[in-house]
């Protein structure tokens, strides 16, 4: 938006934006503005509000080391870069002090250069390096749509890969553009130690709470393996089985079975 306002032309190569000096200036301005606005929102503490008595501290800094993407398809991407390293130890120290760590899509090289990074890359690499339990992406769409355009409630990594294969280049069925950015990142994170990745809408009020604290959620959950699996019962399960069938036995729906009989079966 800043580039458009300034009349600066946007150039892309293979889906990557070329960040020249003018574009980098706009990126720095936008990142600084957003950071200040987020800090202001987290500083709210008015009485008789949900934030009453809150004492939240926000930490930001040069936690992300970046490197240039270089030349792609014969074009120098200039200040467009990728994550080289996340200073996970420094971030953990801040988290141990109960700070919220704010990472921007800007990284710095050991020579002091500034690079424009993709927010998906920063979020994914940070989640991996911190061994996060969850990685959450807020999107314009509700989640990952299936063939009937309903939203997949949950996908394993293998199922998510199949979705991408069936909707890739040359396929008649296409995914929403933001899903094509975030779903591969969710797959990467879940194959490198992150337990769960969530893709949810940023437009739905209460989406984050609904996704995290309800069984079905409101978006798409990506996990390394299925959340629910079937297995043969063992003797350790007898107590739980008795608890499940007792009401049915009491109502005459099932014939009563003793613990000894269940253990034998």
Protein language model regions, located:
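Conserved N-terminal entry element of GNAT/NAT acetyltransferase domains
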Residues: 213-235
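Active-site or pore-adjacent capping/gating segments
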Residues: 194-199, 204-210, 221
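Nucleotide/pyrophosphate-binding catalytic subdomain
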Residues: 1-196, 203, 231-240, 245, ...
């Amino acid at each position: 938006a800043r580039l458009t306002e300034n009349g600066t032309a946007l150039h892309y190569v293979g889906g990557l934006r070329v960040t020249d000096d003018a574009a980098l200036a706009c990126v720095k301005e936008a990142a600084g503005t957003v950071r200040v606005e987020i800090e202001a929102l987290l500083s709210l503490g008015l009485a008789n509000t949900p934030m009453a008595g809150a004492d939240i501290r926000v930490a930001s800094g040069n936690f992300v080391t970046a490197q240039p993407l270089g030349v792609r398809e014969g074009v120098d991407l200039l200040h467009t870069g990728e994550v080289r390293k996340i200073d996970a130890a420094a971030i953990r120290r801040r988290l141990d002090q109960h700070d919220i760590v704010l990472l921007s899509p800007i990284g710095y090289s050991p020579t002091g250069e500034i690079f424009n990074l993709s927010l998906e890359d920063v979020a994914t690499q940070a989640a991996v390096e911190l061994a996060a339990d969850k990685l959450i992406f807020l999107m314009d769409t509700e989640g990952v749509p299936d063939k009937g355009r309903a939203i997949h409630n949950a996908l394993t990594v293998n199922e998510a890969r199949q979705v991408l294969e069936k909707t890739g280049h040359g396929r008649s069925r296409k995914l929403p553009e933001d899903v094509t950015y975030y779903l591969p990142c969710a797959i990467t994170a879940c194959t490198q130690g992150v337990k769960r990745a969530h893709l949810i809408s940023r437009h739905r009020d209460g989406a984050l709470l609904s996704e995290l604290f309800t069984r079905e959620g409101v978006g798409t959950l990506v996990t390394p393996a299925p959340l629910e699996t079937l297995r043969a019962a063992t003797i350790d399960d007898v107590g739980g089985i008795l608890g499940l069938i007792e009401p049915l036995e009491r109502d005459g729906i099932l014939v009563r079975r003793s613990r000894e009989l269940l253990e034998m079966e």
